[in-house]
């Protein structure tokens, strides 16, 4: 049959990461490709316990439809947790999402018409690129350094670019670079957005996974005009399979997200929300996060130290203070996609960095995940990857 697809489908491509993950299902593959949490850290017994209690106590309520906004006790707890990022809100500023990724799709649907401009970090999250592409915007990449987006460059581009509708950023342990914005850059970003009347989407799934240093305030902390939409997630701090995230925004703006969610999936999973809420009642999530951070810090250190030994000195890489990823820049003559093909032949996988640049280029970069593999596999995988790089030098 000749299906008559909408023209927008021409802009929607398979995620390179999702396709790569299919290859990594083989047990012999050492995968640094996905942004996967360590499954051995999932609180399986605790979830089993509280899930039974939820069904026992809530009965049919846990299995029924619920309000689009989400389960009120959980929304209240999230509003309280936002205080650690310097954001003072109530449950009325919180909308439960089916994962933080849903908030990206909703942001595109709410703000973007064909030809509108999205300003983003260079590089930026592949999942956001794919979510926004369905709405046919133009992407303009803003240069970054170790302190985040270079605000002077941002303002120059805003002043010479028409139809800027959205600034999309990941200020904490950015995916893919692992970098974190300075407090000064966060403050200045809001000042620029206020001056030019532009909405900011702040995506922060990794912010609580800080291994060292002080927790900086969210960009939302500096928002005095209600123009910052903050997207949070429990996928990296609890369990990704529950698909639980949230949007935090000014009530007038959040109402648009509620309307869009009603048309998308009516509501976020009731049972999952109640299980998480019960978990938060009975257990200390911050204590659980400390255990995650301890393991990830050890794995980050091991990966970085092994890279220093196994990679040619010409390869540069970031040293993230938290999160899940480090970012490597190869000599310009090495194509990371070709390196990935060579690596997979040796049962090692990573994501070529070119996928994280919406306008292409930068084919000599790669993203490496350190959270998912055990220590021995990290060492062996980096050694294999280093050998493959040396063969291409």
Question: Where does each model-flagged region fall?
Answer:
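Conserved glycine-rich beta-strand-loop-beta hairpin in the small C-terminal domain of fold type I
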Residues: 277, 294-304, 316-329, 342
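Conserved core of the PLP fold type I
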Residues: 56, 61-197, 201, 207-225, ...
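Conserved C-terminal alpha-helix-loop-beta "cap" of PLP-dependent enzymes
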Residues: 253, 328-367, 380
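N-terminal small-domain helix-loop-helix segment of the aminotransferase-like
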Residues: 10-99, 106, 281-282, 287, ...
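PLP-dependent enzyme catalytic core of the Aspartate aminotransferase-like
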Residues: 1, 345, 359-393
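Helix C-cap/helix->beta junction micro-motif
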Residues: 27, 135, 195-196, 226, ...
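Conserved core segment of the aminotransferase class I/II
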Residues: 224-294
